[in-house]
Amino acid sequence: MFEEINLGQPIELVVGITGMESLTAETVTKVRKAWTQSPERYESLFNQIEQLTLSGLECLKTGKVEELGELMNICHGYLNALQLSTPELEELVHIARSNGALGAKLTGGGGGGSMIALCQDNKDAIEAAMNKAGYKTLPYSIG
């Protein structure tokens, strides 16, 4: 089910692309195996990510962009705890945050690929820093 949300203001984003590829099926298999070995830990992480997602939706509906960024940062930590991040994704997340991103997290199936940074007025600086480090970027606005 999709729900149209009136953002009230444009949301500025930069996608950082590692150039690495990973197969979602392999990532799912890896997480499933870890989950069977420690179900309580993984169920807790899954539940926390679900709650962050619902809170993030409320932030979008109410225009709380800074809070959304904080939730993205927390979510990335949980995704990292699920062993879905890579050194390259961690570098991109660090670059984004150290250049003023409100939030940054991996996106997609994990294991490589891409991350997304929530920006304000500093989208160009974040993109330039990622490019300088050798990564491709895709800047865009929503709303």
Which residues are covered by each model-predicted region?
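C-terminal nucleotide
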Residues: M1-A104, I116-G143
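Glycine-rich active-site/cofactor-binding loop and its immediate structural neighborhood
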Residues: G112-S114
